[in-house]
Amino acid sequence: MDSTGEFCWICHQPEGPLKRFCGCKGSCAVSHQDCLRGWLETSRRQTCALCGTPYSMKWKTKPLREWTWGEEEVLAAMEACLPLVLIPLAVLMIVMGTWLLVNHNGFLSPRMQVVLVVIVLLAMIVFSASASYVMVEGPGCLDTCTAKNSTVTVNSIDEAIATQQPTKTDLGLARETLSTRFRRGKCRSCCRLGCVRLCCV
């Protein structure tokens, strides 16, 4: 698709293979695959900003040893890990305190019993707060950590169509609806669901 007058809308360079990734026309119609990949990794968009066409792409998180840790990622990791450390400690304190109160009640002074009850109650509060924080804020912290540490594979429109094209070339069969194909039993033998997947066309 490298014709005269076309240039990448991201880097404005005409060199290299230019491909279409969305429904845009004119000067924003084509771009380099690497340029668009970098733009998507930075912007975290899933659709074209101009025409709204969803990109054919797949996100993959890098292995942990390849992660880059900026200040934002370190803070998010600390926010996510601190409650995960506090939860087992709180459970341990609750179990030990309850065990001491139940099994050794006769050996403990009244003041020590009050101290153990307070410790158990505080451990329950810490456990509840930490568990709530992990459930509410945990996904956001994980997203912050993985945002800069994931790569995207984006397909051009031609590549996306090629991977989803029907294997039969007969126009009559290609125009059939999925329900018609299901009723006629034209599904491939490899399909265990018995119908509506594109691989069974």
UniProtKB/Swiss-Prot annotation:
GO cellular component term of the entry, any: membrane
Stretches annotated zinc finger (RING-CH-type): 1-58
Subunit (UniProt): Interacts with host UBE2J2.
Keyword Nucleus among UniProt keywords: no
GO biological process, one term: protein ubiquitination
Stretches of the chain found on the membrane's Cytoplasmic side: 1-81, 135-201
Domain of life: Viruses
Cell location: Host endoplasmic reticulum membrane
Function: E3 ubiquitin-protein ligase that mediates ubiquitination of host surface class I (MHC-I) H-2D(b)/H2-D1 and H-2K(b)/H2-K1 molecules before they exit the endoplasmic reticulum, leading to their degradation by the endoplasmic reticulum-associated degradation (ERAD) system, thus blocking the immune detection of virus-infected cells. Mediates ubiquitination of lysine, as well as serine and threonine residues present in the cytoplasmic tail of surface class I molecules. Promotes ubiquitination of hydroxylated serine or threonine residues via ester bonds instead of the classical isopeptide linkage.
Entry remark concerning the domains of this protein: The DIRT (domain in between the RING-CH-type and the first transmembrane) region is essential to determine substrate residues that can be ubiquitinated.
Further remark: Murine herpesvirus 76 (MHV76) is identical to murine herpesvirus 68 except for a large deletion at the genome left end of the unique region.
TM region(s), chain numbering: 82-102, 114-134
Protein name per Swiss-Prot or TrEMBL: E3 ubiquitin-protein ligase MIR1
One annotated GO molecular function: transferase activity
Binding site for Zn(2+) 1: C8, C11, H32, C35
